[in-house]
């Protein structure tokens, strides 16, 4: 287990998404690919479409997809593997 915990809530309520103002967050899109990533800031994202696996350095792979509200902590180093084209709203804290 790594010291950086990825948190995920599957299919949060529409009320929660409204309170977070997810619809006003920028959108990120990416085609099928694999790449290393380091989070300099905490990122919260809501997946609109697609499927991907994130493997933290020294940790176990986790799969995410449509309807997931995910928080990636600042300092996390990982590898992204996009299995189906991804579209997500995101916010950096």
Which functions belong to the PLM regions below?
Residues 74-93:
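Ligand-binding loop in jelly-roll beta-barrel domains
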Residues 39-54:
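Short, conserved beta-strand element in jelly-roll/cupin
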Residues 1-19:
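Transition segment at domain starts
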Residues 37, 54, 88-90:
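Short hydrophobic/aromatic-rich beta-strand segments that constitute the beta-sheet cores
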Residues 18, 35-39, 56, 62-63, ...:
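Short histidine-centered beta-strand/loop micro-motifs
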Residues 11, 21-40, 73-74:
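Conserved short histidine dyad/triad with adjacent acidic residue
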């Amino acid at each position: 287990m790594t010291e950086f915990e990825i948190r995920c809530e599957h299919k949060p309520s529409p009320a929660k998404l409204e309170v977070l103002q997810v619809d006003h967050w920028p959108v990120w899109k990416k085609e099928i690919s694999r790449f290393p990533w380091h989070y300099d800031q905490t990122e919260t994202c809501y997946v609109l479409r697609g499927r991907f696996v994130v493997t933290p350095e020294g940790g176990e792979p986790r799969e995410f997809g449509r309807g997931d509200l995910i928080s990636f902590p600042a300092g996390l180093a990982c590898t992204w593997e996009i299995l189906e084209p991804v579209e997500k709203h995101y916010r950096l804290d």
